[in-house]
Amino acid sequence: MTKKRLTRDLKWGFQYFPYYQMRIECEKFHGWAALNELTDGEYMYWDFFEKAGRVPVAGKGMCWLTLIPDGRKHSITAMFMEDGNVSAWYIDVIHSVLIDEDGVLAFMDKYLDVMLTTSGDVLVEDKEELDAAYRSGEFTEEQYEAALLEGQRIIDEWGKDIHATELICKEMLNYVKAQVNNQPLTVFLDIDGVLNIYQPDSEVQTLLPCAGENICELIHRMKAKVVVISSHRLGGRYWDMLLDFFKGNHIYDIDITPYGEEYHSRTEEINAYLHMHPNIERYVILDDCFQDDYSCDLKLREHLVFVDALKGLQKQDIIKACEILNRQAPVCRAVIHDV
């Protein structure tokens, strides 16, 4: 069996896009939900459906909603187009659900899959892999028959009334997005040594073009809020230039950490901001650590990306920042259900 993380990093590379997961307990659904928001990327298509023909499955503006119902043996992923309609479903027969060390949901794939489209296509995939697993002794006869039975249940439950399937997926997507809107991804941003190489003899610092491109890519890719922690936030000519830079790159959700004599370090300022905004749970700190290395607060330090002040913000810093932003809140790191 293969472990599949719902950040979809194994095959699709979605770990560098916004990812959310949560429990849903409502009349129509009980279980886990996960959302991948695709904020960039060229479109990818599946073109093997008899009725639907060529359908988009990934690309800028799309999103994937994955639902794992309690007590069942499958994971259903609805691939939503930018207009809010579903292009296709990919449903995995699964063995178990687990949570990785970074808190991200995953499942153990039991090979057999079902694919659906709104045009009425129903495709059963990878049965030969299931057969091979049975012949090799990986699965017992009971496990093999259970996988086949679950595949048929998937067709009966999700494939018979595709309109109803799309409606419930849309309803769950709306629910998930409402929760996501209350959980902003946040970038605490230093300026000197991050977006520029500080030159003390210069009245106005010059933004490094590559660093500017990198911070804009991070903010747009992760749909993140910016909270400036630099002393430049106190105002002045350079601050006005920074605001113009962000505005010119369509970045408008900008805030600053509190300041005053009562704060003795950036650590205290960031903690004060987090206290004022308890809905912020997922955040990253981009800092060259010239003023504060955050050693007095190990929790904050876990969210730190140390930026080399002689280079400014680099691509590898952005990659690490995405990984930190997609960490999930600590929960039991065990199998949730073994089915």
Which sequence ranges carry the predicted segments?
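Short His-Asn-centered micro-motif
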Residues: I91-I94, L189, I229-H232, L286-D288
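Cysteine/selenocysteine-centered motifs that mediate thiol-based redox chemistry or coordinate metal-sulfur cofactors
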Residues: E150-V180
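Conserved, surface-exposed functional patches that form binding/active-site neighborhoods
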Residues: Y90-G137, S295-C296
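Short, solvent-exposed loop/turn segments at secondary-structure junctions
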Residues: S96, V194-L195, R233-G235, C289-D292, ...
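Charge-rich, low-complexity N-terminal segments
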Residues: M1-M62
